[in-house]
Amino acid sequence: MSEVERTTTIPDEIAILPLLGTVAYPQTIMPLAIGQPESIRLIDDLMAGQRIVGLMALKNEDERPNPVLPEDFYQLGSAAVVHKLMKLPDGTLRAAMQVLERIEIVEIIQTEPYYRAKIRVMPDALAESEQLEVTALMRSIGTIASQIAPLIPQFPTELLNSVLSEEDPRRLAYLVASYARMSVTDRQAVLAEPSIKQKLLKLNEVLTRELNVLQIGQQIQSQVQDEMSKTQREYVLREQLKAIRKELGENNEQEVEVDRLAEQIEAAGMSAEAHQQAMRELDRLRQMPTAAAEYSVIRGYLETLIALPWQKRSDDTIDVAQATEVLDADHYGLDEIKERILDYLAVRELRRKRSPERDPGRGAILCFVGPPGVGKTSLGRSIAKAMNREFVRLSLGGVHDEAEIRGHRRTYIGAMPGSLIQAIRRSGVNNPVVLLDEIDKLSSDHRGDPTSAMLEVLDPAQNTNFRDHYLDVAWDLSPVMFIATANTLQTIPAPLRDRLEIIQLGSYTMREKYEIASRYLVPEQREQHSLAPNEVEIDHEALLVAIEEYTREAGVRNLEQQIGTLMRKAARQVALGSATPIVLDPAKTREYLGKRRYFSEIHERTDRPGIVTGLVWTPVGGDIIFIEATKMTGRGNFALSGQLGDVMKESARAALSWVRAEGEAYGIDPNFAQHYDLHVHVPAGAQPKDGPSAGIAMATALVSLLTGRVLRDDVAMTGEITLRGKVLPIGGVREKVLAAHRAGIRTIILPQRNLADLDEIPADVLAEVQFHGVEHVGQVIELALRAEASEAPVSVPESAVMPNLFQSDVEVLVH
């Protein structure tokens, strides 16, 4: 203990000086650079009175808070006395502090112009029973220090001698802690430990770890030196060879090109396998005349290898709050979709932070499924933006050759890498977000099945060693984030679908289309057509006209085209010098867009018996269909037309059988088939149709036809029928309901068990549409058909004999 330490008494109240990036240990001399105005004021006041100050480490070791608050520094530190002080010309101070003892803050009693606090002294503890262990730890620290010293260039000999000769365990602990490589948090932990034995134990661990790091570093350095010696030898020999050739006049462009490729190969950061392959091909290139056909093939191959981003990657730190802002800014609505995406991103970020040994990409692969124009591709772009990654789109529509994914072997003329490797090359990084667009449009032929190649690409257990046929070296795809899009799941093979996490995107409501148009489409189209906001304005009613009268789609792609047409017309007026702003009202909108394209057909098409409005699902969204039934003089034949599939034909047969069995209860003559043929037609005959969901609509159409009762013009229905008249649940409820709402239908009949699906319907649609859940087709008839008949029901003479044309085999005519 020094003379200063023996004679200095630490008062109960002292000033507090926060330290940035270091911790003050007792029984040491600590140099300080003091530049903060409040700290300079503190030191000046100290020199005028008591020279003792409390040194407390700031918790943030990288940046000093401004202002410094009590919670910004540790409450346990050390008391020190100013030993030496020097003022510099720039006004800052250099001080040498004699650190005395550990102290702890009891209470802050002053905050301005600097902190003062009540403190209590916290002396270190050393039990007699721990003396042997402490002695052993001191010797261990000395041994480790002796091993570390030769591994660190210019290691101070005086420091090693001090460590080896120090007999005071407390002084040794603080001496070693002062020079050891530790973070502020670890340094503070050493200071906070009351037991000297525990301090020495922790320092023993720190020194052992540092020794291991230094030894491994020395081994690596030795290996690098050996490699450098070999490389330098080759370099010297090549330089000598070039000099000899230059003297002989044999220097040519080929050598220059080969040397350039060699330098680029070394700088590319390739994997060991790729580097070995590249050098092998480069040696072949050296020996090959430039006129050889294979020369350009090898050169192209090497340039492709060099251009790949072997070591370049984006910093993909995910901020979930920022991701939320990006998704909300780029897309209106889609709340459930956004929630699922944010959950996915949060899991990736937690896995990256808490389980770095696990590949963060080994999670689910998102697949957005929905109609065209609902934002699948733009969602993928927003995810890349939220993750700070490069985005690249890979269109798979119409791909039917496996080589388009895996690449062509170099034995073929014009061989190229597969589209996946080319996409990564275009992105410039090895961890882009790759959007596999239209994955449901993959097909196969005699050249292979690209779906099989996609299985390897999307499987985390296999894609770490993806081997493109052209490259013929392994490429790690695990850093790549894949997102797929599709219009339907029906054409995606089951093994591929199992690797995807499906997120369904439904149709937009009228309100959502209006919001998307006003927030995104109108400003974007205005900018694309070089129009200023004060030159063209579209009012509320005009947008509704464009949506309701000129588009009928699940997404907004066609709506964007119509808005683009309006902007082109407005741009023409501006170019002609018309007064601005040009206000697009409903009248101008209709003038610019031409004749109306879509009308509400419900009342017009359901004003006679035998016509029913049904609901269908298609890969491009929901739609309404009109099922038409008619009768004619005949002998009981039953015809179907409209390109109906087998399932839909069976639904029609089931509907007819139920009508024949139960029709008398609804006033239908049981012998109607003696003099009449029936024909059920589903318009839009060029479009194939199938599925069981039109069963109740067909039964209702037949009952309407045979009873003369007309369907209510605001009703549509969907549901499967059984021979007993039971109504079974169906799928695609959301798309069908939105299609009905777009068409102006305000009453929808659904199977009872499908009412649970209404929670997927937007609230504004639910408020405008009345839903009826049914379990039997009889309920459908009572809800859908008007009570009075507009035509006389079908009747036949009582003496007529019923032919058996409906008895067993029904003749189905498909026109």
Swiss-Prot record:
It is found in: Cytoplasm. ATP binds at G370, P371, P372, G373, V374, G375, K376, T377. Keywords: ATP-binding, Cytoplasm, Hydrolase, Nucleotide-binding, Protease, Serine protease, Stress response. Its EC number is 3.4.21.53. GO terms for biological process: cellular response to heat; protein quality control for misfolded or incompletely synthesized proteins. Pfam families: AAA, Lon_C, Lon_lid, LON_substr_bdg. The active site is at S693, K736. Residues 606-787 form the Lon proteolytic domain. GO terms for cellular component: cytoplasm. Residues 14-211 form the Lon N-terminal domain. It comes from the Bacteria. One of its GO terms (molecular function) is serine-type endopeptidase activity. Induction: By heat shock. ATP-dependent serine protease that mediates the selective degradation of mutant and abnormal proteins as well as certain short-lived regulatory proteins. Required for cellular homeostasis and for survival from DNA damage and developmental changes induced by stress. Degrades polypeptides processively to yield small peptide fragments that are 5 to 10 amino acids long. Binds to DNA in a double-stranded, site-specific manner. Homohexamer. Organized in a ring with a central cavity. Belongs to the peptidase S16 family. NCBIfam families: lon. This is Lon protease 1.
